[in-house]
From Swiss-Prot:
GO terms for cellular component: cytoplasm. Belongs to the ZapB family. InterPro entries: Cell_div_ZapB. Pfam families: ZapB. Homodimer. The ends of the coiled-coil dimer bind to each other, forming polymers. Interacts with FtsZ. It comes from Shewanella oneidensis (strain ATCC 700550 / JCM 31522 / CIP 106686 / LMG 19005 / NCIMB 14063 / MR-1). This is Cell division protein ZapB. Its main location: cytoplasm.
Amino acid sequence: MSLELLSKLETKIQATLETIELLKMELEEEKQKTSTLSEQNNQLIEQNQQLQQELTSWNEKVTGLVGLLNSEI
C-alpha cells in the first residue's frame, strides 16, 4: 500500500472512532433522560393513586351527606 492510501485509511479510522465516541456520549445522555423520565413516571403514578383515593373518599362523603339529606326530607 502506498503512503497516501495509509494516510487516507488512518483518517477514515480516526473519523470513525470520533463518531463512535460521539454516539457513546449521545447514548449515555439518552440513558440519563430515560432514567429521569422513568422516575417522573413513577412519581406521577403514585400521585395519581393518591388523587384517586382522595376522590373515592370525597365521593363516599358526598354520598353519605346526600343520604342524610334524603332521609331528613
